[in-house]
């Protein structure tokens, strides 16, 4: 089971999701998308919360209002963190999550520590948590199938882009050749005209 929330504080709305337990977190880690941003309470146990960003955006493009929604949701889903003030939330792109065979279920590391960001959360804001909870949906998605569908769509888009680029290049080559042919034809016509003038007769005295 995966819990989905909608952050509608900006337009278009953003999807936030998290697993029910550490076992589902394993699948979320495995089948995350490049557009996903992972959130967790720093140094405390908490839910693994993911924010799905629009394609073509990065972690630096997260709207401030959406970021606040995410960290409040993470804090609220930490047994210890929800009762504490002044905690830190870490977040990083899904692609930066590292999972090795010797790690426990639900445990992760990072490929590059410099890509991990930290935001301080002073206290729980009930209005935000309640608003998000009203959008909560329980689903049983086929994460592997969704990931494959997403990747297939991306491959098709890249294939179409490559084909379009090749088409443009072919048209440019054709246009360049046509310009060269026109240039050569013009030069030839000019040369023929000059030859005709040089061979002409100016006198009417002829036999």
UniProtKB/Swiss-Prot annotation:
Residues 112-189 form a coiled coil. One of its GO terms (biological process) is positive regulation of cell motility. The modification Phosphoserine is found at residue 203. Residues 184-198 have a biased composition (Polar residues). It is a single-pass membrane protein. It is found in: Cell membrane; Endomembrane system. It comes from the Eukaryota. This is Coiled-coil domain-containing protein 25.
């Amino acid at each position: 089971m995966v819990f989905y929330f909608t952050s509608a504080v900006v337009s278009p709305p953003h999807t936030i999701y998290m697993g029910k337990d550490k076992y589902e977190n394993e699948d979320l880690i495995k089948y995350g998308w490049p557009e996903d941003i992972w959130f967790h309470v720093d140094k405390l146990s908490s839910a693994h919360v993911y924010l799905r960003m629009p394609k073509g955006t990065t972690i630096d493009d997260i709207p401030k209002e959406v970021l606040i929604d995410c960290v409040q949701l993470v804090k609220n889903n930490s047994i210890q963190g929800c009762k504490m003030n002044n905690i830190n939330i870490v977040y990083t792109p899904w692609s930066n999550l590292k999972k090795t065979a010797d790690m426990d279920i639900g445990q992760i590391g990072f490929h590059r520590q410099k890509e991990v960001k930290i935001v301080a959360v002073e206290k729980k804001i009930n209005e935000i948590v309640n608003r998000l909870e009203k959008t909560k949906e329980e689903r049983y998605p086929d994460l592997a199938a969704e990931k494959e569908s997403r990747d297939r769509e991306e491959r098709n888009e890249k294939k179409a882009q490559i084909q379009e680029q090749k088409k443009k290049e072919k048209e440019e080559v054709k246009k360049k050749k046509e310009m060269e042919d026109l240039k050569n034809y013009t030069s030839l016509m000019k040369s023929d005209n000059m030859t005709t003038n040089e061979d002409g007769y100016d006198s009417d005295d002829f036999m």
